Amino acid sequence: MDSTACLKSLLLSISQYKAVKSEANATQLLRHLEVVSGQKLTRLFTSHQILPSECLSCLVELLEDPNISASLILSIISLLSQLAIDNETRDCLQNIYNLNSVLSGVVCRSSACHNDSVFLQCIQLLQRLTYNAKFFHSGAHIDDLITFLIGHVQSSEDELTMPCLGLLANLCRHNLSVQTQIKTLSNVKSFYRTLISFLAHSSLTVVVFALSILSSLTLNEEVGEKLFHARNIHQTFQLIFNILINGDGTLTRKYSVDLLMDLLKNPKIADYLTRYEHFSSCLSQVLGLLNAKDPDSSSKVLELLLAFCAVTQLRHVLSQMMFEQSPSGNILGSRPKSLEPTAALLRWLSQPLDGAENCSVLALELFKEIFEDVIDTGNCSSTDHFVTLLLPTILDQLQFKEQNLDETLVRNKCERMVKAIEVLLTLCGDDSLKMHVVKILTTLKCTTLIEQQFTYGKIDLGFGTKVADSELCKLAADVILKTLTLMNKLKQLVPGMEVSFYKILQDPRLITPLAFALTSDNREQVQSGLGILLEASPLPDFPAFVLGESIAANNVYRQQETEHLPRKMTFQPLNHGFSTSAKCLTPPPSKDNAPALNIEDLIEKLQAGVMVKDQISDIRISDIMDVYEMKLSTLASKESRLQDLLEAKALALAQADRLIAQYRCQRTQAETEARTLAGMLREVERKNEELSVLLKSQQLESERAQNDIEHLFQHSKKLESVAAEHEILTKSYMELVQRNEATEKKNTDLQTTCESLNKHIETMKKLNEALKQQNEKTIAQLIEKEEQRKEVQSQLADRECKLSNLHKIAKSQEEKLNVLQKEKEDKQETIDILRKELSRTEQIRKELSIKASSLEMHKAQLEGRLEEKESLLKLQQEELNKHSHMIAMIHSLSGGKISPETVNLSI
């Protein structure tokens, strides 16, 4: 069974199931879905024909039905997942059929029914649809979906946690409305804590999902500043590179690359990465991932390397690592490990058209960035050997070796050509690298390339051609202009290049791409077109008038397209891959809907013209015939396109009828809901009146309570004043207590002083008694000496012997007298001190006057005694003087050796 028959059978079975939802019809529909899924009709669904579009519309409508079985939902989702692998079909499902909102409703219904299999398949399909795509938050069920996903992530972990995290990461990325909704939730802090706890998960996929959500929600907030602070950012870099290099698969690697690219858009984090000490080793491991055979994984790695090139310092590190100096004589197969990335890039660059088209384009962009850095740093000599290997591969990309390619493959080929020519233009920025290009690029290759673009790009002579209608025509024009720019730079170095360059500039077919460039919204294309126009305008055969007409026609077409934009049935395409799909379903301007001439009339005129032309021997007749044949084929293609658009209009009309019926049903439901709401409003008004009465009573009670509060407030003021007075009295009482304590302390000090004085007085008494005893002894000795002096005359011999002893005794007595004199002086000083202390004590303590008076009396007695002692001492001094005279007289009588003046017996 061919593909068209399969789709017709599927459409018929869907109609039967919608009419009668029986088990037999459901089984038949499941069987047809399995047949379509088994035939892998992805290319057919991307062709934008009526039958596949109707099938997709019916399948989406079935998903909206809440009464279909789970097995049928799973089968439909399986088919849609298979179709969503193609980027163009994925965008169509999102933007035209609004599959995101439909699947969100299915998720909410399946979660309520606890159907995990349907829930898992829907989440996985939503994750595939929303990955790296614009997401409209205004769709139905989207808010419920986000709330449900957050709640499920915060619940206990199961097999659905990982896809829920992945879908949340897609929804939050570059979507401010979703981020705002999540940030306004009441449990957002607990959600952040849950995500942070997932950073320690054993699965690297869960870790990168959680980190991606955190970066989308908190990167420019306080939580993000703490999470991505300079203290933590190096650990975050290490974690991301670890996930990127050792990830669980292509999915994990994709999300880790997207996360790192989003972080690099922050200038502060990009600066942190330039100072990351392990960046070189991590970059080396990332370059090693290019050796993998998975094109999806390699394309994400190439995107990451291009993101590194957006930061000048990182691009410099990358170029140094790509072109490290290798030992001389090495060929590509025997190069050291440091040059393996260049070999991997060459391998991805030379992939076939039906292979990894993204990898080839990204590899060429990476070469352009690297060579720009090499030229800026002046390190072109290190790339000479690699450039000789790269240029043949690039020139292979500039040739159409395959024949009978479809439009998609031709478009991919043109994209590669554009990037390859940009690499050659970059190499021409340095003289030494330009010479490598001159050696391998010939004039024939450039002219052949331009002629091929005139052919494959369907660029004719007519001005006003709708270049914006055809993506292929855009790419062909870009290839032609960039090739001419390259020829302009090399025209003085390549033989024959200058002649061919100016010849092509005078070709009328150049008008269409030149007009497209001058009316483009791309700055580089406008600059390139102006450069070519500057070279072509002085030429004599340059069709300047035709160029002006073409530019005017393009401007008119753009204006009409802008005016018809609100009437278009489809959404605007969101990325490059979906542009042609939207344009195929979009009607052209009104002036092209009705061609001026019918095709049969043109054929008759052409045949008549041929009969006449057979008789005319003009050389230009064949050229005119080619022009008319090209016009004829163009009109035929336009007629077929109008027929397709008519069928699309009919289909759109049927869909509009269905939408009108749905609107009528929704209107009746809305009226019913309005009546219900009116009844509810009346009930609310009645309750409001009851509440108003209750409110008045509450107000009276509140007024009474307010009066009571005022009385209590006045009473509290009085209590506060009493409390203040009490506090003042308490302070004064404490001050008096402190003064009393100080006085008591002084009293105790004075008592101790008095006791010490009493002790001193007792010691003085003892000393006086001792002095009395000594005086008595001295008197006895003097008496004895007086008796001895009476016996001197009879005992002169004995006296001479005893004279020495007496002399010694006199000396000892003299010493004792000195000691007594000193003690007397000490006593005098002590008496002075005591006088001072007594006077001070008398002033301080008047209450102790009785004791002070007794002390004064005692003092007077002591002074009397001291005076008596002094008188006694004077008497003793006089007696000693008498004794000294007597001793002197004795000596004078004995020998006359000692004069009375020399004898001193004074104390």
Curated annotation (Swiss-Prot):
Record PTM Phosphoserine, positions in chain: S906
Tissue distribution of the protein: Highly expressed in 17.5 and 18.5 dpc liver but not expressed in adult liver. Expressed at moderate level in embryonic brain, muscle and epidermal layers.
GO cellular component, one term: cytoplasm
Modified residues (N-acetylmethionine): M1
Keywords in alphabetical order: Acetylation, Chromosome, Coiled coil, Cytoplasm, DNA damage, Phosphoprotein
Subunit structure: Homodimer. Interacts with MYC. Interacts with PPP2R5C; this interaction stabilizes CIP2A. Interacts with PPP2R1A; this interaction stabilizes CIP2A. Interacts with TOPBP1; forming the CIP2A-TOPBP1 complex.
Protein name, as recorded: Protein CIP2A
GN (gene name): Cip2a
